[in-house]
């Protein structure tokens, strides 16, 4: 797997679709801070997005979509002057999967959210800006538009297994949105995500993710990237925020933590599978990274 696929798989990414929103005239709907990573896509018309803590509203055009990666209240509206109504009330009145605001049907949005397993905040969400906005005219955004159109069709026509298919399509959309964001704004992300935008660092990251149990050295990684050891070490540290071997240690611990959360494998077998020669070596590294011994983590996996 490549690093992005690896992390999204580790986090057990799932999507949840909500009712669509049809609006017209002058309207505004305010939403409480979502407990998931919220997404919306404008399928028809235009509107504004205001997010708590963000100074300027974002103009959304037909075909635009966005992710909210932080739990912040937000408002969708036609104009700045209209007083917002509570989104919970609006969506409680939804019929046939469609909520309505204002008068008319000038605007049509589909939306939902993404949920992740343990460790999502540190591994992924903190690496992204609070808002990831993908305008419809973004280069190479055709696949995002294809996924959104397919979701729209599934929700409109409701063939068999439409919800399941639409939710899987939403995950496909998420991956493409993240790809496009890395292409458009590589400096707006941090950590390993930022590393994917640097071809030298990305090569090293891919090697570490493909074979995390290998006894990698900086020289090995430099050879795969066709640069000197000093160049690789400097670029990796500057981009990712830590050295390649420190990153490897942390990724190994994430893999070990997943096995502790999800299975009954012995600590010895887990240690071997992620590149440690003994239980004690894994235990020392695990406590240094996550702040508790592996045995305690297995009992209380949500504590760090």
From Swiss-Prot:
Keywords: DNA-binding, Transcription, Transcription regulation, Transposable element. GO terms for molecular function: DNA-binding transcription factor activity; sequence-specific DNA binding. SMART domains: HTH_ARAC. Residues 202-300 form the HTH araC/xylS-type domain. Coiled coil: none annotated. The keyword DNA-binding applies. SUPFAM superfamilies: Homeodomain-like. The keyword Transmembrane does not apply. It comes from the Bacteria. Residues 219-240, 267-290 bind DNA. It comes from Streptomyces lividans. This is Putative AraC-like transcription regulator.
């Amino acid at each position: 797997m490549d690093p992005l696929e690896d992390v999204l798989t580790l986090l057990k990414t799932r999507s949840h679709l909500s009712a669509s929103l049809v609006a017209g005239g002058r309207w505004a709907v305010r939403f409480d801070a979502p407990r998931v990573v919220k997404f919306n896509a404008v399928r028809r018309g235009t509107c504004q997005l205001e997010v708590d803590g963000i100074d300027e509203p974002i103009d959304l055009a037909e075909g635009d979509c966005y992710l909210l990666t932080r739990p912040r209240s937000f408002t969708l509206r036609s104009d700045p002057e209209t007083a917002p109504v509570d989104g919970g009330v609006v969506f409680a009145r939804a019929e046939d999967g469609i909520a309505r605001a204002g008068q008319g049907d000038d605007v049509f949005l589909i939306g939902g959210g993404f949920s992740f397993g343990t460790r999502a905040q540190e591994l992924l969400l903190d690496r992204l800006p609070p808002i990831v906005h993908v305008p419809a005219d973004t280069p190479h955004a055709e696949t995002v538009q294809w996924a959104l159109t397919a979701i729209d069709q599934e929700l409109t026509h409701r063939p068999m297994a439409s919800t399941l298919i639409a939710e899987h399509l939403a995950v496909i959309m998420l991956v493409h949105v993240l790809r496009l964001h890395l292409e458009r704004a590589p400096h707006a992300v941090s950590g390993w995500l930022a590393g994917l935008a640097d071809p030298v660092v990305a090569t090293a990251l891919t090697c570490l993710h493909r074979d995390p149990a290998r006894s990698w050295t900086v020289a090995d990684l430099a050879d795969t990237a066709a640069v000197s050891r000093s160049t690789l070490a400097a670029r990796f540290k500057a981009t990712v925020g830590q050295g390649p071997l420190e990153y490897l240690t942390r990724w190994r611990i994430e893999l070990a933590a997943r096995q502790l959360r999800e299975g009954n494998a012995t600590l010895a077998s887990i240690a071997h599978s992620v590149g440690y020669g003994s239980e004690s070596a894994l235990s020392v590294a695990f406590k240094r990274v996550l702040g508790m011994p592996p045995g305690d983590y297995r009992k209380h996996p949500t504590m760090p």
